[in-house]
Amino acid sequence: MVSDSCHHCGRDSYRSPSVVVDAVVTRGSGGSKEVLLIRRGHEPCKGMLAFPGGFVDYGEDPEDAVIRELKEETGVQGSNPISIAVHGDPSRDPRKHVIALFYLV
């Protein structure tokens, strides 16, 4: 979808989704597994439970971003993230279209 044209060169500009990462952290084994969640401090969905995560910075590797976001939001130092899912529903975030990459950390 073309969103605009460059005023200088006339080329089309395209809107692209932003990339976010979510950390899935578990502990325990068998039937007593626990999952680490945070309570969102800001809109959208303020006060709701969520996986720790956030936006990937420009030039940042998503695997580095998920480790950074996990540390920033929980104080937990993760390592060796493993990609487990991708979620691209345009309605997931009311602010903008995001592609969410889920990592087991």
Regions found by a protein language model. Give the residues of each.
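Acidic, metal-coordinating catalytic segment for phosphate/diphosphate chemistry
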Residues: 1-24, 29-30
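Short polar/acidic secondary-structure junctions
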Residues: 14, 28-30, 40-43, 92
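Conserved Nudix-box catalytic region and its N-terminal flanking loop in Nudix hydrolases
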Residues: 32-76
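A short coil-to-beta-strand element that immediately follows conserved catalytic motifs
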Residues: 76-85
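Active-site-adjacent beta-strand/loop module that shapes the phosphate/pyrophosphate-binding cleft
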Residues: 87-105
